[in-house]
Swiss-Prot record:
Keyword DNA repair set for record: no
Higher taxonomy: Eukaryota, Fungi, Dikarya, Ascomycota, Taphrinomycotina
Subunit structure and binding partners: Homomer. Interacts with other proteins that exhibit high sequence similarity.
Membrane topology of the entry: Multi-pass membrane protein
TM region positions: 73-93, 110-130, 201-221
Basic and acidic residues bias locations: 19-30
Name this protein carries in UniProt: Meiotic drive suppressor wtf6
GO BP, one annotated term: meiotic drive
Length: 263
């Protein structure tokens, strides 16, 4: 089958393409020879060539410029020394308060002081060398403590908001304790025996402590749960029993309602 393809380009367009092929880019320079048979070579000014040979950047001009943002050595040393001073400040203040700072030192005291200076020096070296590690640990600890304080503040606020009836709850529990103590004294004096009196006292105090705590919690969480609600429940129960009794007395028997069935 013959190829009947005919070019639609005019002779003028073909001359323009030949001119543009032979033009030289002033920025890129003349085109080097490209051998299409070699697979390893790439045509110049192509996208792959740009990826393999990235453009010259300003960062390559300064290869010695470091990107390390760590603190300088003197700042690390100063912060570590300040932390050691703050750690030793309470001991120095205590010695100043006792008026024993570098006074009447013997051989043992000077030996201990020298050992302590050695420990502080080693601590200073360690803190300076491991500066990033211990500062990060301090930051994490401070953040954790701040979160704990925030949580405790929310808990106290919730406690004060929901447990606002603490005074009345304390008064009710105290009144309950006084009544129970009076009953315990009467029972102990009535029994007379010391052994039984001691047992009654121990039982009464245990029951009083547990009951007062429960009453305090119940009255604080739900005010009136141990007094007002109890009275209301008793009144409701008594009213229910009265209604049941009245309904049972006023009920009409079936034979009175239907006398025809009886006949």
């Amino acid at each position: 089958m013959k190829n009947n393809y005919t070019s639609l380009k005019s002779p003028i367009d073909e001359e323009d393409e030949l001119k543009t092929d032979h033009e030289i880019d002033l920025e890129k320079g003349p085109l080097p020879e490209y051998d299409s048979e070699e697979e390893s070579t790439l045509p110049p000014y192509s996208d792959h060539a740009r990826l393999k040979n990235p453009p010259y950047t300003h960062r390559e001009k300064n290869p010695s410029r470091s990107t390390d943002n760590s603190s300088p050595f003197l700042i690390k040393l100063l912060i570590s020394f300040t932390s050691i001073i703050l750690f030793n400040a309470p001991a120095v203040c205590y010695l100043k308060y006792k008026d024993a700072f570098f006074k009447n030192y013997g051989a043992a005291e000077w030996t201990l002081f020298g050992f302590w200076c050695l420990v502080c020096t080693l601590a200073l070296i360690s803190l300076t060398y491991f500066y990033e590690t211990w500062t990060k640990a301090v930051k994490v600890t401070v953040i954790s403590l701040a979160q704990c304080v925030k949580a405790c503040g929310k808990g106290i606020k919730h406690f004060l908001k929901n447990w606002r009836n603490m005074i009345f709850a304390f008064c009710k529990s105290s009144l309950f304790c006084l009544v129970l103590l009076k009953a315990e004294n009467e029972l102990s004096s009535h029994l007379g025996d010391q052994q039984w009196g001691w047992k009654c006292s121990a039982s009464a105090f245990t029951f009083m402590a547990v009951s007062s705590i429960l009453i305090f919690i119940a009255e604080t969480v739900e005010p009136g749960s141990c007094s007002t609600d109890l009275v209301k429940r008793v009144q409701a129960y008594c009213g229910y029993e009265a209604r049941q009794y009245a309904s049972s007395n006023t009920a009409i028997p079936l034979h009175e309602m239907n006398p025809e069935n009886e006949a």
